Amino acid sequence: MPASVVKPLDQSAAIDALLRGVPLPPAGWQANGPSGSADVQDQYQLAASVYGGVTCSWIDEWLLAQHAGDAARVQRAAAALKSSRSWPGLVAMSRGGDYADVVWEFADVISGTRATTAAGGKLSAYRTRIGGTSVTVPTGVGDYRSALGCDMPASK
C-alpha cells in the first residue's frame, strides 16, 4: 500500500500525531476521522477531517463567545485559529492540496488579518444554530461549515 494510506488500526495514532501542537477546542470536543473510518483512509483526507473538526469547533466557539459577549473566549478562539498557520500537520497538507489554504482564510478573517474569505466572499451576515443557540455569522465569514466540511458525518 502507498505510504499515504492510514489503516483502520493506525487511525487513532495518526489522529493523535495530527493534533500535536494544535490547541484543542473546549471540553466536550472529540477528534473523529472521516465517515467510514473503519475503512482504509488516505492521510490527506484523514487530516482534512481532523483539522476541519478542530477549525469548525473553534469557529463555533468564536461565534458563541461573540453571542455571549465574552471577549476572553472570543480572543482565545481567534488566537487558536490564527495559530493554525503553525500546526505541523496542516502545514504539511498545504504541499499536497488546497485544504490548508481554506482553513487559513477563515482563520485570517476571524483573527482580523483579512477582510473576507474567498469561500465567503462578501456575503451578508446570516443566522445559524450551534447546538441550541442561534448566532449571527458575520459578513465575510460566509458558509464556513460547507467550505470546511463541518457538516460531513464523522465516526469515532
Map each language-model feature to its residues:
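Extracellularly exposed regions in secreted/surface proteins, prominently low-complexity, repeat-rich
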Residues: 1-7, 94-156
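Surface-exposed polar/charged interaction patches
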Residues: 8, 12, 21-28, 65-68, ...
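Extracytoplasmic low-complexity, Pro/Thr/Ser/Ala/Gly-rich segments
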Residues: 1-48, 150-156
